[in-house]
C-alpha cells in the first residue's frame, strides 16, 4: 500500500518539492537565504501596498498620516514595523546569500554570477528609489546624503550629483 503523500495528485507535488526533494545530503542552512529573500520581498510588497493606502505625501500631512496609520488603522503599527524591519532583513539575507556564494565558489559559474550581480545592482537601485521617492519624512535626507556619495567620484562627481538632483539642491522635506 502506497503512502497518500505519494499517490494523491496534489500531495505528490508538495511531497516532491518539500519532503523527498532531490538535494544533496551535505546541504546546510546557508542555502535557505534565497527562500528567505522571497519571503522578505513578499512581506515588503504587501505591507508597502497597505501602508500606501493610508499615506499622504504632502509636507503638512505626511507625519499625521503616519500617526494615523499607527493609531487608527487595525494593526497599522505592525504593518509599519514589519515594513521597516523587513527591509533590513531583506538586505541581511541578500548579503548572506552573496556571502554564501563567495564562500562556496559560485563565482565560477560566470553567467549565473553575472546575472546575480545585475540583480544585486537592480535591488540596490530599487531600494534607493523606494527610499527617496515615497515622498515622506526621510526623502530629503535620502536624496541629499545618499546621492552626495557620488560626489566622491573624481572629476565628474559633482556634475553627477547635480544631474541626478535636476538642479543644485533638493527643496522640501517631501518631494511633492
UniProtKB/Swiss-Prot annotation:
InterPro entries (alphabetical): Cyt_b/b6_N (IPR005797), Cytb/b6-like_sf (IPR027387), Cytochrome_b_N_euk/bac (IPR048259), Di-haem_cyt_TM (IPR016174)
Keyword Transmembrane appears in the UniProt entry: yes
Segments passing through the bilayer: 33-53, 77-98, 113-133
Keywords: Electron transport, Heme, Iron, Membrane, Metal-binding, Mitochondrion, Mitochondrion inner membrane, Respiratory chain, Transmembrane, Transmembrane helix, Transport, Ubiquinone
GO cellular component: mitochondrial inner membrane
Residues that coordinate or bind heme b b566: 97
Alphabetical GO biological process terms: mitochondrial electron transport, ubiquinol to cytochrome c
Pfam families: Cytochrome_B
GO molecular function: metal ion binding; ubiquinol-cytochrome-c reductase activity
Chief location bin: mitochondrion
Gene3D superfamilies linked: Cytochrome Bc1 Complex, Chain C (1.20.810.10)
UniProt feature coiled coil, ranges: none
Cofactor dependency: heme b
Note: Heme 1 (or BL or b562) is low-potential and absorbs at about 562 nm, and heme 2 (or BH or b566) is high-potential and absorbs at about 566 nm.
Subunit structure: The cytochrome bc1 complex contains 11 subunits: 3 respiratory subunits (MT-CYB, CYC1 and UQCRFS1), 2 core proteins (UQCRC1 and UQCRC2) and 6 low-molecular weight proteins (UQCRH/QCR6, UQCRB/QCR7, UQCRQ/QCR8, UQCR10/QCR9, UQCR11/QCR10 and a cleavage product of UQCRFS1). This cytochrome bc1 complex then forms a dimer.
Function, in words: Component of the ubiquinol-cytochrome c reductase complex (complex III or cytochrome b-c1 complex) that is part of the mitochondrial respiratory chain. The b-c1 complex mediates electron transfer from ubiquinol to cytochrome c. Contributes to the generation of a proton gradient across the mitochondrial membrane that is then used for ATP synthesis.
Protein family membership: Belongs to the cytochrome b family.
Protein name as annotated: Cytochrome b
Organism per entry: Tomopeas ravum (Blunt-eared bat)
Organism phylogeny: Eukaryota, Metazoa, Chordata, Craniata, Vertebrata
Gene, per the UniProt record: MT-CYB
